[in-house]
């Protein structure tokens, strides 16, 4: 099932307020696994003609790769027609690749929400470093694809490593969608974090994952305004002021979480404007 048709209807009604990123046709993994890139490229082109503005790849999330089972490594030759298509058309790609590094343990060091959320991965899941390697292979072959890596590419604890990627591949961007661990990690070294965000202010985009729980819910449910506001408050508290506050489990967005100290770093107005909206234009 997909929410793309509903999203395209919203875009048709409010064309200046909605942008739609299609997902893949998951049935192609089972029908044409050995030619997956060719058939997904055709599907993405059709969705582009329907009015989609980009592609969202969720298959880089380890749980998705395990559930699907039939997803080839992203650097395998069968994907090449898709990567070539995306590079030739400059069709943007928002990619959820990997998950927080703490998901790979050890369990005793993992945050409470990872442990209680059953998000600890064993060797039956794809390894995060293996996926980073696959992505590096793709970037070397197709450096001009417009990639946006969600959740700071899950490198909020490795900003120098992320900086090297941004320096090497000028078309790569990242977004700041929570994952709580992003905000925990950035609060640990606000001087380094502020320097990174000011330097790469042209390469960072706003994101929230607002509405994700509605889409993933087994039964239809309305958008939770309190959760939406909690997500935005978490982001704003990091970037807009020299925040110094203890964030506790609130039952809205912060669920099963450890208490943590959030330290903000008061980004410049120029950087905020770019991150919040200008970089999406």
Predicted regions and their residues:
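Helix C-cap/helix->beta junction micro-motif
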Residues: 14, 88-89, 142-143, 168-169, ...
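Active-site gating/metal-coordination segments in enzymes
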Residues: 3-119, 124, 173, 178-180
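Short, surface-exposed connector motifs at secondary-structure boundaries
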Residues: 120, 141-148
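Distinct, well-ordered alpha-helical segments
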Residues: 3-11, 32-44, 104-110, 128-140, ...
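H/E-rich (His + Asp/Glu) clusters that bind or coordinate divalent metals
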Residues: 130-137, 146-281
